[in-house]
Amino acid sequence: MSDLPRHSPRRQHAGESAVTAITSPEDTTKAVVIYSGGMDSYTVLHRALRAGFEVHALSFHYGQRHSRELETAHDVCQRLGIAHQVVDIRAIHGLIGNSALTDATQTMPDGDYDADNMAATVVPNRNMILLSLAIGHAVNIGANVCFYGAHGGDHVLYPDCRPEFVERMNDVAAIADFTPVRIAAPYLHASKEEILADGLAMGLDYAQTWTCYLGAERSCGHCGSCRERLAAFAAQGVTDPLVYAGAGASD
């Protein structure tokens, strides 16, 4: 059993949107978006574009077992004609590499996306590291807002996706440089299903995303990340446009 603390997504009140406001009167026209190539950050990317920001997307190679998400992110940004950098920080792999996402000798957990099953996929301090680099880039290019794709379904498993983490990082980002930077996580209180619903309402094509923890030609359909994605599509009554190899997934 995992000894991770139990957190649940915040309960939504009647009439309350799961998508939080992403603009502030103090925002500049430029924004940095941490973009992995997955469906959460893909939806955040388009939310920022719809809000009128000049988006500068950052993707990070931190020693992941495969680069399918990064390739997907590159293709999407090229298609959209937006600034995009893939930042190679694999030098830190020896410091934070004890995760099934970064260590090919570890078994990737199958099954449901929950704390007990998915604890092996935690990369220590990942979002703090990536946000710190994104904040520095924002200051460098004259942006004062950084977006990332934390969502309510990750609160149980990933401490750096929880509301209290975002709140504290905002406090630090406001004083870490002469230029305050705001961290925005528009889906912080949303489920994967709600993120998908928002993206579908924007007309997004989720064939342009990669979710699977494995880097095969087709998504496996049985890792925790695939199962969460498939459940979101099923809940929306929509067929996932990706072609899956795993048993129980759509062909």
Curated annotation (Swiss-Prot):
Zn(2+) binds at residues 212, 220, 223, 226. Residues 1-21 are annotated as: Disordered. One of its GO terms (molecular function) is ligase activity, forming carbon-nitrogen bonds. CDD domains: QueC-like (cd01995). ATP binds at residues 35-45. GO terms for biological process: queuosine biosynthetic process. Keywords: ATP-binding, Ligase, Metal-binding, Nucleotide-binding, Queuosine biosynthesis, Zinc. Pathway: Purine metabolism; 7-cyano-7-deazaguanine biosynthesis. It catalyses: 7-carboxy-7-deazaguanine + NH4(+) + ATP = 7-cyano-7-deazaguanine + ADP + phosphate + H2O + H(+). Its EC number is 6.3.4.20. InterPro entries: QueC, Rossmann-like_a/b/a_fold. The keyword Metal-binding applies. The keyword Transcription does not apply. Its cofactor is Zn(2+). It comes from the Bacteria. Binds 1 zinc ion per subunit. Belongs to the QueC family. NCBIfam families: 7-cyano-7-deazaguanine synthase QueC. Catalyzes the ATP-dependent conversion of 7-carboxy-7-deazaguanine (CDG) to 7-cyano-7-deazaguanine (preQ(0)). This is 7-cyano-7-deazaguanine synthase. It comes from Chromohalobacter salexigens (strain ATCC BAA-138 / DSM 3043 / CIP 106854 / NCIMB 13768 / 1H11). The gene is queC.
